[in-house]
From Swiss-Prot:
Transmembrane segments: none
Subcellular location, record wording: Virion
Entry GO CC: T=3 icosahedral viral capsid
S domain, virion shell: annotated span: 62-245
P domain, projecting: annotated span: 246-254
Protein name per the record: Capsid protein
Source species taxonomy: Viruses, Riboviria, Orthornavirae, Pisuviricota, Pisoniviricetes
Region ranges (R domain, interaction with RNA): 1-61
InterPro entries the UniProt entry points to: Capsid_prot_S-dom_vir (IPR000937), Viral_coat (IPR029053)
Listed Pfam families: Viral_coat
Amino acid sequence: MMVRKGAATKAPQQPKPKAQQQPGGRRRRRGRSMEPVSRPLNPPAAVGSTLKAGRGRTAGVSDWFDTGMITSYLGGFQRTAGTTDSQVFIVSPAALDRVGTIAKAYALWRPKHWEIVYLPRCSTQTDGSIEMGFLLDYADSVPTNTRTMASSTSFTTSNVWGGGDGSSLLHTSVKSMGNAVTSALPCDEFSNKWFKLSWSTPEESENAHLTDTYVPARFVVRSDFPVVTADQPGHLWLRSRILLKGSVSPSTNL
């Protein structure tokens, strides 16, 4: 081929290098940086019977404390000779020996679970029945017979020798399907209410409305059978879980 004089000649162009390919014809991707990224980590909350404490997420919310599920001995089921008098137990953190010191460092509390479990310690030949229930208003009179007792909240009754399978409830949150005698406070009614924390025993002259500000309920237990000789046919156990709120000096709750 002839080339014209004076015409610029172009050097042959070299082919551009192709990107290195992996098997399959795909282009190798650029790797990501493996440098650690600083991110806030939220620790997992404890569950079960572990005691839990924390601070509210919203500014201005007081510190709180969750006791988790706790089993406590409430007392013996006593029957007085010749009478059918009732035993009355105040629903209060004062009944919880394991958290008494901690509870005194808070101003308010709320029951999340409050269940009484009766365990018999008498023979099946023992006469009489046990009656259990709660009074939600401190102005309510303590029942003196089965008719008035039956109108109490979460009323339950059984032979005094019944309820042997309730012992399984003291070690698990699973409801026993066997022979258990229990009475549980309807704590859902207090889901939006806090009670003042106090170790004081309500006085007879105290206004009932004032008492209701720190005592959500009373647990009542009685026998329908007047025994000749005083006895103790069984024991009362408490399964509870409470919330505490508002840090204060422990000396405030004496």
